[in-house]
Swiss-Prot record:
Belongs to the germin family. This is Putative germin-like protein subfamily 1 member 12. Residues 65-216 form the Cupin type-1 domain. PANTHER family: GERMIN-LIKE PROTEIN SUBFAMILY 3 MEMBER 3 (PTHR31238). One of its GO terms (molecular function) is manganese ion binding.
């Protein structure tokens, strides 16, 4: 093989090796849906935020204060209170793919079964004892659970239903980081039984193998 052909072969191999990196998937959406429009009048950036002029950016755009303060859980029907720190609280998080929450749990309080459609979550227990877990997808439906104490860490994979329960004798506190500036949250009970407009009770009755009257009562409770 002469030098010219060798040179072309090397270029071909380099191009082939970089091809998988060039064929990348679309970025994950940061909102529930994005309807295509032909004019910008009713358009919205996919990440949900317009960018501030870099010359006007200040340190306060990257700052939030108050996560050291406990939140009351007494008024919560599930005995917990979630303080969210995402792009709506810290504008500087826009496009950075990360956010944070503080979760306060009363005695016997819980963060009920829910899912984050756009984020993996890593949770750190600061105070107390939590029983936590997540479920794998159908058909296995495996429950992965663990009892966590102060300093313990647990990961909830993106999109999977998970929960935390305070099983200690004192209030508990945890901090969690999520891999999205706007991870979203779907609380299973609230979504199914508190949807607007409400779903036909017969649909849920068949799905859960319950009397429709039970579903109607649940819809009244969550609605």
């Amino acid at each position: 093989m002469n030098m010219k052909n060798l040179y072309l072969a090397i270029l071909y191999l380099l191009a082939a090796s970089t091809l998988p990196f060039a064929i990348a998937s679309d970025p994950s959406p940061l909102q529930d849906f994005c309807i295509g429009v032909n004019t910008p009048a009713n358009a919205l950036f996919v990440n949900g935020k317009f960018c501030k002029d870099p010359k006007l950016v200040t340190a306060d755009d990257f700052y939030f204060s108050g996560l050291d303060k406990a939140r009351t859980t007494e008024s919560s029907p599930v005995g917990s209170n979630v303080t969210t720190v995402n792009v709506n609280q810290i504008p500087g998080l826009n496009t950075l793919g990360i956010s944070l929450v503080r979760i306060d749990y009363g005695i016997n309080g819980q963060n009920p079964p829910h899912t984050h459609p756009r984020a993996t979550e890593i949770l750190l227990v600061q105070e107390g004892t939590l029983f936590v877990g997540f479920f794998s997808s159908f058909p296995e439906n495996r429950l992965f659970n663990k009892t966590l104490n102060k300093g313990d860490v647990f990961v909830f994979p993106e999109g999977l239903i998970h929960f935390q329960v305070n099983i200690g004798k004192q209030p508990a506190v945890a901090f969690a980081s999520l891999s999205s500036q706007n991870p979203g949250v779907i609380i299973i009970g609230n979504t199914l039984f508190g949807s607007k407009p409400p779903i036909d009770p017969n649909v849920l009755a068949k799905a859960f193998q319950l009397d429709p009257k039970v579903i109607i009562q649940l819809q009244k409770k969550f609605g």
